[in-house]
């Protein structure tokens, strides 16, 4: 099943979706509820064993979901998994796998020191785990998150105190308290055009810094 939730867009995309994809369930919000609250609303309607949180500015491949289902079926202790994300030019996106953003890790990242030494300064982007190697990681990107519906319900979804940004870090960390592992599934790739659905303005900057401070 495909559930599309629209956060008060003004570009006629709701009408387009309903016309071109009549089998898709489209929910149109009158107001912009924010990333987490909107996804929680959609997830409550999902009936499958698995849920995949997927941004509108992504492209998945023919066997993407099949690969993730098979991976989770074979690994019952996996909590949340995510793919190797690349941008529209084919460049690897570092946020595909991350460590917890401690103050030290965030400082190293903001100063660009991770480019000098992955071993000493690469915690933010979990650079100890190679790009093309599957492995455990603390944080996965909200642009593509795959997990069992049961786990999503146990976690009570995203924390709706985050309007946008930071909710993926929060939910990735909370699954640890339930004894599950997050996993970077490098052999499955997804194209992410990175922010094409988000306007960059003062409100965007404020939401980002508020999320990082929460």
Give residue spans per PLM region.
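A conserved acidic beta->alpha catalytic loop
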Residues: 6-15, 31
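Acidic donor-diphosphate engagement hotspot in glycosyltransferases and nucleotidyltransferases
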Residues: 13-14, 38-39, 63-65, 77, ...
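Glycine-rich, basic loop-to-helix element that forms the pyrophosphate-binding segment
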Residues: 28-46
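Short aromatic/hydrophobic "clamp" motif used to bind/position activated sugar donors
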Residues: 51
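Conserved donor NDP-sugar-binding/catalytic core segment of glycosyltransferases
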Residues: 59-95
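Short, flexible, basic/aromatic active-site loop/helix in glycosyltransferases
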Residues: 100-137
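Aromatic-glycine-rich donor-binding/catalytic loop that engages nucleotide-sugar donors
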Residues: 127-165, 174-180, 185-187, 193
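Active-site-adjacent helix/loop segment of glycosyltransferases
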Residues: 169, 173-214
């Amino acid at each position: 099943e495909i559930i599309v939730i629209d956060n008060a867009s003004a570009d006629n995309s709701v009408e387009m979706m309903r016309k071109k994809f009549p089998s898709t369930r489209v929910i149109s919000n009158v107001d912009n509820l924010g990333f987490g609250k909107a996804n929680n609303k959609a997830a409550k309607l999902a009936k499958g064993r698995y849920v995949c949180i997927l941004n509108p500015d992504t492209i998945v491949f023919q066997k993407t979901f099949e690969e993730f289902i098979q991976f989770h079926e074979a690994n019952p202790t996996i909590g949340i998994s995510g793919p190797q994300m690349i941008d529209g030019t084919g460049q690897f996106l570092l946020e595909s796998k991350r460590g917890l953003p401690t103050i030290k890790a965030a400082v190293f990242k903001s100063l660009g020191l991770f480019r000098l030494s992955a071993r000493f300064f690469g915690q933010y982007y979990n650079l100890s785990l190679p790009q093309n190697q599957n492995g455990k990681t603390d944080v996965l990107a909200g642009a593509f998150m795959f997990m069992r519906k049961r786990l999503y319900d146990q976690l009570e979804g995203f924390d709706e105190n985050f309007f946008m940004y930071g909710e993926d870090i929060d939910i990735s960390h909370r699954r640890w308290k339930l004894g599950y592992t997050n996993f970077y599934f490098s052999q499955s790739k997804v194209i992410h055009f990175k922010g094409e659905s988000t306007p960059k303005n003062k409100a965007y900057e404020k939401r980002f810094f508020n999320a990082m401070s929460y």
